[in-house]
A protein has these predicted regions:
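Short glycine-cluster motifs
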Residues: 1-26
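Catalytic alpha/beta core of large soluble enzyme barrels
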Residues: 13-17, 26-177
């Protein structure tokens, strides 16, 4: 039929970045093997070994220590370090302030606001943005995406709000475990 995942979300080709008509015509003619290809899952161990963040998650902390059976490994947000180096703000004092702030840079007065906004941790970010990012990815994920929301003071109202927002906006699964 030439129907792709984003078609089932009600998107029209003119709203998308690329032209899909030729691919859809080829699918109509030849079909698709392994048609369910995209499922975004947590990649904790692999990402930490490679010095990346987990899948599409926001950083839970800009600096922390990963404890494993093989030893303890420091995890540092490389992009943040690069940006702070570029403006002359990455040094031992800044590193120590981030560690003292549980991985946050929000309290460091010498860090420009643009970087404070860019490098908010998962705990500092309004969770509606996490949900909106999941919705934006949804039309291009044919299986599912495994994501987390972080609440310092969770309650029934906050949790229900997140779950219902996801359901109302077409996210495929509300809970697992």
């Amino acid at each position: 039929k030439g129907i792709l995942q984003f078609d089932m979300w009600g998107y029209e080709e003119k709203e998308l970045m690329h032209e899909w008509k030729n691919l859809k015509n080829m699918i109509k003619k030849y079909g698709v093997r392994n048609s369910l290809l995209v499922a975004l899952m947590p990649t904790a161990s692999t990402s930490q070994i490679l010095g990346n963040n987990e899948c599409f998650e926001f950083f839970t902390s800009n600096i922390y220590t990963r404890n494993t059976l093989a030893g303890d490994f420091p995890i540092i947000n490389k992009q943040m370090v690069t940006d702070l180096l570029d403006i002359g703000e990455w040094n031992t004092e800044t590193k120590d302030l981030i560690i003292a702030g549980n991985g946050s840079i929000q309290h460091i007065t010498s860090v420009p606001t643009i970087f404070k906004r860019l490098y908010q941790t998962q705990w500092e970010l309004k969770q509606i943005w996490v949900l909106k990012a999941a919705k934006a990815r949804g039309p291009f994920i044919d299986q599912t995406q495994s994501m987390n929301v972080f609440m310092e003071e969770p309650n029934d109202q906050k949790l229900n709000s997140c779950l219902f927002w996801g359901w109302e906006n077409g996210l495929k699964s509300g809970l697992y475990y």
